[in-house]
Structure formats: C-alpha cells, structure tokens
Amino acid sequence: MSAVASIKEFFNTFFLLELLKGMKLTGRHFLSPAITVQFPEEKTPLSPRFRGLHALRRYENGEERCIACKLCEAVCPALAITIESEVRDDGSRRTTRYDIDLTKCIFCGFCEESCPVDSIVETHIFEYHGEKRGDLYFTKDMLLAVGDRYENEIAANKEADAAYR
C-alpha cells in the first residue's frame, strides 16, 4: 500500500467518514414528510386489473354465463377450481357445481383470461376473511351472489381494461 492510500484510510477510519455519510442520508430522509397510508381509514386507488375475490357473472336476461367448458379448471395452476356439469334438454352444457377453494388460489388470473364468455372474473374485493377453513370455500351460489352484487363495478372495470387488451 502506498503512503497516500494509508493516510487516506487512516483519516477515513479516524474521523468515521462512512458513519457521517450514513447519518447525513438518514437525517435527510428523517426530515422529509411521511408517505405512509393509514390503511383502514385511507385506501389507495386500485388498478382496473387488480385481482381480488372471484365472481360468476350472468347475462342481462339472468342466465348464468358459464358454459361448463372447464378451461378455467384445466388452466388453474393451484387446482383450486372444481367444476361438474350436465347436459340440458336443448343440448347445451351448464354447471351443476362450481367451487373455488380460496385457500389454494394464488390469484394469478388465468381462469379469468381463459374464460371464452367472461363468466369468471376477479373483482376488486380484497377485504374478506374466514374464521374457519370452510369459510374460504366458495360455491357456485356464493360466486353468483358476488357477481350479482358487483356487476356494475365489474362491467366498468372490464370496459376500462378493454383498451389495453
């Protein structure tokens, strides 16, 4: 080591320059205003592509959209979707059972993307809980109820997102 380098190292160590540089940075951020969001009282805006609680949609005439193609069940990487179907008198298929286990679901959105009739969607609802494991097991009727309740919001989000697809 040269004499200049050893003198420089001595001054850095003796005067604790690294510590002073760190304290300067800490002081600068300490005096800046806080950007913390107080969550239950304040909420940040959500993207139209936010993926929350699932819902099944209906057509305007009240008929459920799901045609029991089972693409969502096949594409689900977590195997959280279970579908059973039967053939109706007119030859079309409809679901008799459509269950989503939210304890398995990873909210990837593949089910929504694979659905050819926009039946299964993920809403902006993220404030839900379950006290027992079975509370997070959503049946067809529960999913349809969520879809019926939030249909206007779902349609608005689909329309806002349509420009980017």
From Swiss-Prot:
Q: Keyword set for this entry?
A: 4Fe-4S, Cell inner membrane, Cell membrane, Iron, Iron-sulfur, Membrane, Metal-binding, NAD, Quinone, Repeat, Translocase, Ubiquinone
Give the record's GO biological process terms: aerobic respiration
Q: Name one Pfam family in it.
A: Fer4_7
| Predominant location category | membrane
Q: Which residues form a coiled coil?
A: none
The residue ranges of the 4Fe-4S ferredoxin-type domain are 57-86, 96-125
| Cofactors that this protein relies on | [4Fe-4S] cluster
User: Quick one: which residues bind [4Fe-4S] cluster 2?
Assistant: C76, C105, C108, C111
Q: Which reaction does it catalyse?
A: a quinone + NADH + 5 H(+)(in) = a quinol + NAD(+) + 4 H(+)(out)
Subcellular location, record wording: Cell inner membrane
Q: Which residues bind [4Fe-4S] cluster 1?
A: C66, C69, C72, C115
PROSITE patterns in UniProt = 4FE4S_FER_1 (PS00198), 4FE4S_FER_2 (PS51379)
Q: What is its EC number?
A: 7.1.1.-
Its GO CC terms?
plasma membrane
UniProt cross-references to InterPro entries, sorted A to Z:
4Fe4S_Fe-S-bd, 4Fe4S_Fe_S_CS, NADH_quinone_OxRdtase_chainI
Query: What molecular functions are annotated in GO for this chain?
Result: 4 iron, 4 sulfur cluster binding; iron ion binding; NADH:ubiquinone reductase (non-electrogenic) activity; quinone binding
As for membrane topology, the entry says: Peripheral membrane protein
Cofactor stoichiometry and binding remark: Binds 2 [4Fe-4S] clusters per subunit.
Could you describe the subunit structure of this protein?
Answer: NDH-1 is composed of 14 different subunits. Subunits NuoA, H, J, K, L, M, N constitute the membrane sector of the complex.
NCBIfam families for this protein: NuoI, PRK05888.1-4, PRK05888.1-5
Q: To which protein family does this belong? A: Belongs to the complex I 23 kDa subunit family.
Q: Function of this protein? A: NDH-1 shuttles electrons from NADH, via FMN and iron-sulfur (Fe-S) centers, to quinones in the respiratory chain. The immediate electron acceptor for the enzyme in this species is believed to be ubiquinone. Couples the redox reaction to proton translocation (for every two electrons transferred, four hydrogen ions are translocated across the cytoplasmic membrane), and thus conserves the redox energy in a proton gradient.
Official protein name in the record: NADH-quinone oxidoreductase subunit I
